[in-house]
Amino acid sequence: MTNEVQSIFNRIAPVYDQLNDWLSLGQHRIWKEMAVKWSAAKSGNTALDLCCGSGDLALRLARRVGATGYVYGVDFSCNLLETAKERSQKQYPQPAIAWVEADVLNLPFDDNQFDAATMGYGLRNVKDIPRSLQELHRVLKPGAKAAILDFHRPSNPQLRAFQQLYLNSFVVPVANYLGLKEEYAYISPSLDRFPIGKEQIELARQVGFAVATHYPIANGMMGVLVVSKF
């Protein structure tokens, strides 16, 4: 499953940002800023962005930690990391970001290394959610927070029907037009498999996070899991 998802993200790298725009009706930038704030990253911090994709969240973290801080952006898609590098090279001043090709289930970092962390649209796609949360817990410093943003199936039946209609009538046809129909077919099954908010809280607590809170946004079609390590 990991190799399959990795291949999907390598193939969709050229239109990855458009995908987020389509899925979020262009609102993902607002939600990413919310996630960065919930991570409590501060000037001078060493921060981590998991499943960094094309680098949008990592660049926002870099602005937050400033010139005296440092950010590590991690993804298993070499194509997306290349896009992220190109984006960061166009920034002025140059952000202090290291782009790392790695699996979030086996992070190449020391214990207690990071002051803050984010993950945007990644947890839903990992093969082993408890393992990824365990790794996140391991690399965070005591007292650090992480904010995990992702799409969800809303509990409201009408909103759930609207979400599925939108996927079927807009996102899939556009993907088909771009020749990426099979690549986008994973979205609905991934939403169906993804644990709901209270289940995410329980998983976070099981791996050692002292505090875990889930904030539904966009009428439950989106959510942010905020966790703290003590």
From Swiss-Prot:
GO biological process: methylation; phylloquinone biosynthetic process
Keyword Transit peptide set for record: no
Catalyzed chemical reaction(s): demethylphylloquinol + S-adenosyl-L-methionine = phylloquinol + S-adenosyl-L-homocysteine + H(+)
GO molecular function: 2-phytyl-1,4-naphthoquinone methyltransferase activity
Pfam family of the protein (one): Ubie_methyltran
EC top class named in words: transferase
Gene3D superfamilies xref list: Vaccinia Virus protein VP39
InterPro entries: MenG (IPR032904), SAM-dependent_MTases_sf (IPR029063), UbiE/COQ5_MeTrFase (IPR004033), UbiE/COQ5_MeTrFase_CS (IPR023576)
The EC number(s) this enzyme carries: 2.1.1.329
Keywords, alphabetical: Methyltransferase, S-adenosyl-L-methionine, Transferase
Pathway membership: Cofactor biosynthesis; phylloquinone biosynthesis
Functional summary from the UniProt entry: Methyltransferase required for the conversion of 2-phytyl-1,4-beta-naphthoquinol to phylloquinol.
Family: Belongs to the class I-like SAM-binding methyltransferase superfamily. MenG/UbiE family.
PANTHER family given in the database record: 2-METHOXY-6-POLYPRENYL-1,4-BENZOQUINOL METHYLASE, MITOCHONDRIAL, METHYLTRANSFERASE
Protein name (database record): 2-phytyl-1,4-naphtoquinone methyltransferase
Species of provenance: Nostoc punctiforme (strain ATCC 29133 / PCC 73102)
Taxonomic classification: Bacteria, Bacillati, Cyanobacteriota, Cyanophyceae, Nostocales
